[in-house]
Amino acid sequence: MINNENESLIAAECHAQADEKKAMLEVENLTKKFGDLLVLDDISTKIYEGEKVVIVGPSGGGKSTFLRCLNVLEDPTAGRILFMGNDLADLKVNINVQRQNIGMVFQQFNLFNNYTVKKNITLAPVGIGISNMRKQKIKNAFVPIYNKFYKKYGDKINAKIDAEKEQLIKQSEELKAVLKDVSAEWEKTKKSEERQGKTYATYDPELTKKKLKLTAKIEKKERAVSHKNHIAEKQVVAPEFSSKKEIKAHAEENAMRLLKRIGLEQKADAYPSTLSGGQKQRIAIARALAMNPKVMLFDEPTSALDPEMVGEVLDLIKELAEEGMTMVIVTHEMGFAKEVGTRILFMSEGKITEENNPKDFFEHPQNDRTKEFLRKVLNA
């Protein structure tokens, strides 16, 4: 993914500095294909707590697809995405629960035109709050029954779990040894192909299938290992809210606080069709913030705005950045990327071909494709 020794050292230095913080998102060998078209090509990277990672690059390079995979709006063909240690591809992981901690802001706002601004912001918190309250009450009802079962059979079950885990780890290591050889042969078949004016990487289809099958088998074994955890006694946990009325009141109070923050408190009862593009995007950001996310994903948040409205949206994102929010931002605004980003990723042909801190990325690019891109966009 990184093309030469200097770039590899720079990437390693970026990750070494970030490793002092907690990894929020871990991307391992992420591949995405649409039919025979390879859009994301074996991407691996980490997003750390508090980072503002800005992704730039030519159109068709896979930036938006990568962002959509992070929130599982697109299913990866192969590879893993871990969010706070949870594998998002694992069927046993509740994706909707994980998404509550990953805010997403789209190019086209995606507001509900038949709801007021306030209801757009409160819709998800109220719905999820009621669902969580009900689920917790049901769980609490079964705690005494479960604990009786644990006292009788817990030790035997945990011993069986340990034996199964050891066997799965052994099988996974054997598959990794085979994958290493197949990957080496697969890389030798790489070719560049022009489609509709864009360059894509292609590989031998049979080796690609073999590589993906092996990767999927390894992922399945590793997911199974991650679930081989000892059982233990459970405790009754009180729900955060005790009634629907309490949930709705809390959500509306939070919505008004967010609207006041973005200067649109007076628009609480207005409908999206009456708002400007800049106002809609600020409300879309407030809606994402209403879930108190750990990470915010921005997919070209200003691309659908008139030029005079871009500034108000970028200013709001800058405020969030200054407060320490972890962010991943796809943008064509190079000045904004330089000012806000703590790390810049350059994507081309489905790969991260360069990454660095903003100053060195813009002043001392290493990759030829990066240099060409910056010449075009900065001199435009």
Spell out what each predicted region is.
Residues 79-90, 134, 138:
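Conserved ABC transporter NBD signature motif
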Residues 71:
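Helix-to-loop junction immediately C-terminal to a conserved catalytic motif
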Residues 270, 291, 323:
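Conserved signature/switch motifs of ABC ATPase nucleotide-binding domains
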Residues 271-275, 279:
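Conserved ABC ATPase signature
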Residues 296-299:
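Catalytic Walker B motif of ABC-type/P-loop ATPase nucleotide-binding domains
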Residues 88-103, 210, 244-252, 364-365:
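ABC ATPase NBD coupling module
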